[in-house]
Amino acid sequence: RDPLLVRFSLEAWYRQRAREVFARRLAELAPRLPWLSALPDFRLLNMRTQWGSCSPSGELVLNPQLVKAPRVCIDYVINHELCHLREQNHSPAYYRLLDSVMPDWAKHKALLDSLAEVLLNR
């Protein structure tokens, strides 16, 4: 087999899987947050140094490589970005909000950080 074709096919599979998994996790997590009246849109973007971001207009951007991480790490990133829909910065108020949504977020962030090099480079 052509190695480039295999790589392209694998990346396409990961993107499709990411779209499915992130939509399912977002649909489960978002309704728990009283400041959200609807599910926010999200798109996928490969990023070298970020797992996600939130635009000022409220669009979530998620790294498709995140789908390779454990579910608790995916939930952490999604919750992190959903909290930005209420607090657009990393202020103490933001972290209080994140603590209220996911009290053990720091443990999941540490796990994700420990896996980042492997997940982002495969």
Label every PLM stretch briefly.
Residues 81:
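Walker B catalytic acidic pair
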Residues 1-76, 85-122:
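Active-site-proximal or metal-binding-adjacent scaffold patches in catalytic folds
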